[in-house]
């Protein structure tokens, strides 16, 4: 198995499970058909910047600390808050007007928020069109988008 594939699997396993030790991680990997030495797992953990975090119960488990991603999301949210002029909707879609040349970046902020019920996002120069998967959830989606501004 290629290094990238193994490391992607490690990230997925850590996101989906509370893994407390390298031995436990090794067991999960083996359950997925991947054999890796303790040294390899240790190197992967270091390269992937995986840390141990404490739970409310005082136990420790591995977690992905993605400070670069968090920082980018914070900047996108800040741009979104300052660039959005109006948020309106009809029965089929949400229409967001932005300051000129900021719709694409604002669309990225919405995408990164991973909101439910979005079928697709189309951005222009100063307008974002969002289509929904389920019309009954449109009002909730509008509220979630507005919460990014607050």
From Swiss-Prot:
The gene is argR. Pathway: Amino-acid biosynthesis; L-arginine biosynthesis [regulation]. GO terms for molecular function: arginine binding; DNA binding; DNA-binding transcription factor activity. Its main location: cytoplasm. The keyword Iron-sulfur does not apply. Belongs to the ArgR family. PANTHER family: ARGININE REPRESSOR (PTHR34471:SF1). One of its GO terms (cellular component) is cytoplasm. Coiled coil: none annotated. It comes from the Bacteria. Keywords: Amino-acid biosynthesis, Arginine biosynthesis, Cytoplasm, DNA-binding, Repressor, Transcription, Transcription regulation. Regulates arginine biosynthesis genes. GO terms for biological process: L-arginine biosynthetic process; protein complex oligomerization; regulation of arginine biosynthetic process. This is Arginine repressor. It is found in: Cytoplasm. The keyword DNA-binding applies.
């Amino acid at each position: 198995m290629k290094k990238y594939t193994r490391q992607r699997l490690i990230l997925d396993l850590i996101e989906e499970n509370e893994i407390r030790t390298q031995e436990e991680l090794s067991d999960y990997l083996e359950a997925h058909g991947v054999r890796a030495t303790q040294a390899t797992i240790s190197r992967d953990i270091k390269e992937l910047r995986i840390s141990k975090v404490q739970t409310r119960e005082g136990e420790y488990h591995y977690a992905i600390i993605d400070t670069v991603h968090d920082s980018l999301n914070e900047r996108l949210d800040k741009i979104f808050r300052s660039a959005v002029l109006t948020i309106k909707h009809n029965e089929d879609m949400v229409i967001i007007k932005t300051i000129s040349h900021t719709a694409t970046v604002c669309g990225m902020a919405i995408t990164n928020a991973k909101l439910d019920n979005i079928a697709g996002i189309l951005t222009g120069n100063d307008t974002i069109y969002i289509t929904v998967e389920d019309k009954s959830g449109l009002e909730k989606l509008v509220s979630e988008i507005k919460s990014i501004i607050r």
